[in-house]
């Protein structure tokens, strides 16, 4: 029986399931129920997080997983429920080298991102900048990952603004599909710390032959660029190579 077409499922926010042949890789499992955590401090939007529940059918989406990637340890990427899920030890986990000790303290036996294949999938770690200047330094290291499957090269960029590290990853790996953490996350001080709607549109127009999938919106209080804001900007910029999935939506890479 031939393998199903490769696909990327947005669970919620930055939580993804990459369906690549026999592998099903979860990225950044944020699994807390709505309102379980306080709002991100220093944001103009005070609502508790997550802003929305997991989508209907989320439990089924998280069945049959073969591996996990944790791009960094901020709570909107690995929360208490997500850590408990990974600590069950049912699947291998890869994370940033800087995070391995903390993951171990949470009962998660992880290896460095890119140190080994994820099952049958080659994976390489990429860098990024979680903002600009001193604020990015304070927020700490972030990573992305490039996975290869058949003719697809999938770049999960992680929590980065457009930066030298991001542009280098596009140049070196020439991905066919890029997942961008959008939302224009921002605090009361400094510049946005994830991709803004304008950045997504500009990047897409700079790379017209690449498919971009924008996630990281409408679920966490400091992500102020909503899906509606992004879609309006993409229409204004005539950027037609960006998909903006809803929670629970599967994007087939054909």
Over which residues does each language-model region extend?
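Metallo-beta-lactamase
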Residues: 1-3, 89, 94-152, 232-254
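Catalytic core of the metallo-beta-lactamase
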Residues: 4, 10-23, 117-176, 195-198
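Short gly/ser/thr-rich secondary-structure transition/capping motifs
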Residues: 7-10, 47-56, 77, 158-160, ...
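Pre-active-site segment of Zn-dependent metallo-hydrolases
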Residues: 23-69, 80-84, 133-135, 162-172
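Active-site neighborhood of phospho(di)ester-bond hydrolases with catalytic His/Asp-centered motifs
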Residues: 27-30, 64-76, 94-96, 155-160, ...
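Active-site environment of divalent metal-dependent phosphoester hydrolases
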Residues: 32-34, 74-78, 100-102, 116-119, ...
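Metal-dependent catalytic neighborhoods of phosphoester/phosphodiester hydrolases
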Residues: 79-89, 222-230
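Cap/insert and terminal regions of metallo-dependent hydrolase folds
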Residues: 161-247
């Amino acid at each position: 029986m031939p393998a199903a077409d490769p696909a990327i499922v947005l669970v919620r926010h930055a939580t993804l399931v990459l369906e690549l042949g026999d592998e099903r890789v979860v990225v950044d499992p944020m699994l807390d129920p709505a309102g379980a955590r306080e709002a991100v401090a220093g944001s103009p939007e005070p609502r508790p997080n997550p802003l929305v529940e997991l989508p209907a059918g989320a439990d089924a989406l998280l069945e049959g997983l073969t591996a996990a990637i944790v791009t960094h340890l901020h709570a909107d990427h690995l929360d208490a429920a997500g850590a408990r899920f990974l600590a069950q030890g049912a699947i291998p986990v890869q994370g940033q080298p800087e995070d391995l000790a903390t993951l171990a303290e949470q009962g998660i036996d992880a290896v460095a991102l890119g140190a080994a294949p994820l099952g049958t999938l080659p994976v390489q770690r990429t860098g990024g900048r979680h903002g600009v200047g001193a604020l990015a330094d304070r927020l700490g290291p972030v990573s992305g990952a490039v996975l290869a499957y058949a003719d697809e090269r999938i770049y999960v960029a992680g929590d980065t603004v457009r930066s030298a590290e991001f542009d280098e990853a596009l140049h070196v790996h020439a991905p066919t599909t890029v997942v961008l953490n959008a939302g224009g996350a921002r605090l009361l001080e400094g510049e946005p710390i994830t991709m803004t709607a304008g950045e997504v549109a500009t990047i897409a127009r700079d790379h017209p032959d690449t498919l971009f999938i924008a996630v990281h919106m409408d679920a966490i209080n400091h992500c102020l660029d909503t899906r509606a804001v992004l879609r309006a900007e993409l229409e204004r910029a005539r950027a037609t190579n960006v998909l903006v999935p809803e929670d629970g939506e599967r994007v087939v890479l054909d």
